[in-house]
Amino acid sequence: MKSLVLLLCFAQLWSCQSAPQGAGLGFRELACDDPETEHVALIAVDYLNKHLLQGFRQILNQIDKVKVWSRRPFGEVYELEIDTLETTCHALDPTPLANCSVRQQAEHAVEGDCDFHILKQDGQFRVLHAQCHSTPDSAEDVRKFCPRCPILIRFNDTNVVHTVKTALAAFNAQNNGTYFKLVEISRAQNVPFPVSTLVEFVIAATDCTGQEVTDPAKCNLLAEKQYGFCKATLIHRLGGEEVSVACKLFQTQPQPANANPAGPAPTVGQAAPVAPPAGPPESVVVGPVAVPLGLPDHRTHHDLRHAFSPVASVESASGEVLHSPKVGQPGDAGAAGPVAPLCPGRVRYFKI
């Protein structure tokens, strides 16, 4: 009798050990570094970047968790938690993600945290749920390894607003073509030595020419939007200020015949102080939706929590079908072998 009891116990123990993880719970578990998991994670990042209207494009840094749920009658749903890092490419920049550099820790990096539910059915992928938020590295941590590195400051900082207005005025003064308006302050930093302010901002072409503008408020954005991304530095000296600005204009679709073509984007060196232009417009159109600009706010970065509308965060109202990204991201090594534990996966760049 005792032998029979022992035999039954061993049989139950063997069945528990041989069952795959997640069996009986309605899901299967994959390793976070499994090629299948990484494939779906890259689809999630591609979806995120396509829905960004402000701030900077994201790149996959780490896969934290993954579960694959069966969906009746067909298909399965991937439940993912991933970490991303900010790149130096703006959300409106058409540069392929593989050519975008990851913003380094010395530049005051920003990390994103995202949850995705992605349906796979008949070989196609559809995002059912997407929710993200992002957080900059703490100033204290940045100063630990780089005491003189520039630190993120608020968009509504007096020096930031002044630097953006001065830089945009300098750009328009040197540009003999289209007059550009401010769309977004994307990033701002204080530099301790030499004392200066670094800013990155987005501009858009209007139906005015630079030499004819008397009232910027009457200048309207073109029907075929053309955006540009600018980086500027304003050095604060006792004897005055020095501003330098460089803008990259993004390619646009053919414009109407009566639109003024934009000239080449000049780089302004050490320009004399320029009278700031009129304040920014009350609202501008960014991508498919209107985004109120108003006055710069107290944020230091554009949080990913604003990337998705309430509809998109639950399910794609348009039934958008997603396809695998054609180009892998930079710095990716080959697929990792079996790991223990299954998750979290490897860190591709750095943790903050």
UniProtKB/Swiss-Prot annotation:
Q: Has keyword S-adenosyl-L-methionine?
A: no
Pfam families recorded for this chain?
Cystatin (PF00031)
- Fetch the CDD domains from UniProt: CY
Q: Which domain of life is it from?
A: Eukaryota
Keywords, A to Z?
Answer: Disulfide bond, Glycoprotein, Phosphoprotein, Repeat, Secreted, Signal
Per the record, residues carrying Phosphoserine are: 134, 138, 309, 313, 316, 318
Q: Supply the Gene3D superfamilies for this chain.
A: 3.10.450.10
Q: Name one GO biological process term.
A: regulation of inflammatory response
Task: Return the protein name.
Answer: Alpha-2-HS-glycoprotein
Glycan-modified residues: 99, 156, 176
| Taxonomic lineage from the root | Eukaryota, Metazoa, Chordata, Craniata, Vertebrata
Species: Rattus norvegicus (Rat)
Family that this chain belongs to: Belongs to the fetuin family.
Q: Using the UniProt record, give the first listed, main subcellular location.
A: secreted
A GO molecular function assigned to this protein is: endopeptidase inhibitor activity
Which residue ranges does the record assign to the Cystatin fetuin-A-type domain?
A: 19-133, 144-250
The residue ranges flagged as biased composition, category Low complexity, are: 256-273, 328-338
Q: What is the disulfide pattern of this chain?
A: 32-343, 89-100, 114-132, 146-149, 208-219, 230-247
Quote the subcellular location field of this record: Secreted
Q: In which tissues is it expressed?
A: Synthesized in liver and secreted by the hepatocytes in the blood.
Q: Which residues carry this modification: Phosphothreonine?
A: 135
User: Per its UniProt record, what SUPFAM superfamilies does this chain match?
Assistant: Cystatin/monellin (SSF54403)
Q: How is it modified after translation?
A: Undergoes complex post-translational modification involving N-glycosylation, and addition of fucose and sialic acid residues. Phosphorylation occurs at a serine residue. Phosphorylated by FAM20C in the extracellular medium.
Q: Does the keyword Disulfide bond apply?
A: yes
